[in-house]
């Protein structure tokens, strides 16, 4: 995927008034984020319903400056920026109307492997719940050892699922509600570091984004969207 497409995808996410579904619609209609900017003057003819206000907003130079800044951060920190047209982008998630235009990824797991399951649950996991999770993954490892385990690195069942996955030699992905410049909760850093060697960390949020409450709701659609079973 070209750097231009990465920059244009990141810039689109920062266009005032466009929103995620609006940006996804433009990229889907024209085939790429780059083409959205190349054809911005005639967007109202190419994509019905696009307002002049949005067309004017696409000239936002600050959006491009921030996009270039973020891509520099990614390059320095060995983070992959996966756009919708990137072959590494989760194909199941791409089918969703609210799919992120770009994902930030550190790790070595194939996000399009055949078997991907989601294990999530309460943040106040009981010993019984933890035991069920552990036994399930132990049994699964004998049947489908190449399964990718996805969760949210949160307290409770999430972190237990990641740790049980690592113990059973699964690759496991943590979908984060913040940028890749931090780990939240901080107590899970050791597990997160292990996951970078046996799975990875994934987010739609740029560096500097805090783990605010609304971001956890947004990230849940990614946890669900990349999985075959959940």
Placement of each model-derived feature along the sequence:
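Short, positively charged patches
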Residues: 1-145
């Amino acid at each position: 995927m070209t750097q231009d497409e990465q920059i244009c995808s990141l810039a689109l996410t920062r266009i005032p008034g466009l929103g995620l579904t609006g940006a996804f619609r433009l990229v889907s209609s024209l085939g790429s984020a780059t083409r959205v900017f190349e054809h911005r003057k005639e967007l109202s003819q190419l994509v019905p319903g696009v307002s002049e206000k949005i067309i004017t907003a696409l000239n936002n130079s600050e959006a491009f400056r921030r996009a270039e800044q973020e891509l520099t951060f990614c390059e320095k920190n060995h983070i992959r920026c996966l756009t919708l047209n990137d072959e590494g982008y989760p194909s199941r998630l791409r089918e969703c109307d609210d799919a992120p235009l770009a994902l930030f990824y550190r790790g070595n797991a194939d996000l399009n492997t055949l078997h991907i399951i989601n294990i999530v649950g309460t943040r106040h996991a009981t010993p019984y719940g933890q035991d069920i999770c552990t036994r399930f993954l132990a049994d699964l490892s004998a049947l489908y050892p190449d399964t990718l385990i996805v969760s949210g690195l949160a307290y409770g069942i999430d972190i237990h699922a990641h740790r049980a996955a690592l113990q059973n030699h699964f690759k496991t992905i943590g979908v984060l509600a913040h940028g890749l410049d931090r780990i939240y909760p901080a107590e899970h850093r050791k597990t997160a570091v292990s996951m970078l060697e046996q799975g990875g960390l994934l987010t739609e949020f740029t560096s500097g984004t805090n783990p605010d409450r609304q971001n956890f709701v947004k990230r849940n659609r990614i946890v669900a969207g990349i999985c075959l079973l959940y």
